[in-house]
Design a protein with these regions (language model features):
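ATP-dependent carboxylate-amine ligase catalytic core
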Residues: 24, 31-39, 65-162
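Conserved beta-strand segments that form the floor/walls of ligand-binding pockets within enzyme
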Residues: 45, 86, 168
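Generic secondary-structure boundary signal with a strong preference for alpha-helix termini
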Residues: 60, 162-165
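Short beta-strands and strand-loop turn motifs
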Residues: 41, 148, 167-170
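Short gly/ser-rich anion-binding loops that grip negatively charged ligand groups
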Residues: 46, 53, 95-98
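Short functional linear segments
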Residues: 1-48, 55-61, 65-66, 73, ...
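Gly-rich Lys/Arg/Thr-decorated short loops/hinges at beta-loop-alpha junctions or inter-strand turns
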Residues: 10-11, 111-114, 165-169
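Residue-level signal for inorganic ion chemistry
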Residues: 12, 49, 70, 146, ...
Length: 170
């Protein structure tokens, strides 16, 4: 599994970590090809200059304590890409937070990159990660997503969401 995960990370990082092409067309098209999983979820969308990660962590914890199954999407990661995509579940008291497994992460990176490649869509690294997150949280049937923006602004890939319960600016 570790080798498959490393190959997924290699594919992900080859997609243009420092490549920026403003617009939501690419991510929107890929999400449409995936069945628009982002439209089946509800969000607390967190943006701002400083403190986004802290606000996201606190908000996700409060929602979990309130009995919600929470998807948490933050960046950057410290050790592994899987740290960015977590599920906080009130049903599991021993481990209230679970990172996406390397197996699920790899499967979704390969699936999304294959769809993008077949349709001549050139996604950035952040767009791929965001697509992985949307699909994974749909699969996990989370009640709500706490979503941290990437670069922020109108063309941030996280801005394709439609069911925004609350927008928070730090």
């Amino acid at each position: 599994m570790e080798k498959i995960y490393k190959n997924a990370v290699k594919l992900l990082t080859s997609q243009g970590k420092f490549y920026i092409d403003l617009g939501l067309d690419r991510i929107s098209k890929v999400m449409e090809l995936l069945g628009n999983p982002q439209d089946k979820l509800e969000y607390f969308h967190v943006a701002g200059t400083n403190g986004k990660g802290s606000v996201c962590a606190i908000l996700a914890s409060v929602l979990r304590q309130a009995g919600k199954k929470v998807g948490l999407y933050t960046s950057p990661h410290i050790f592994e890409y899987t740290e960015r995509i977590q599920v906080l579940d009130c049903q599991n008291n021993l481990s209230p937070s679970r990172q996406i497994s390397k197996e699920a992460f790899s499967r979704l990176v390969f699936e999304i990159c294959e769809i993008a490649d077949k349709n001549d869509i050139h996604l950035t690294e952040f767009e791929i990660l965001t697509a992985v997150m949307f699909k994974y949280f749909e699969e996990q049937k989370v009640d709500v997503v706490v979503l941290e923006t990437g670069l922020g602004g109108r063309f941030d890939a996280t801005n394709i969401i439609k069911k925004n319960l609350c927008a928070i600016i730090t």
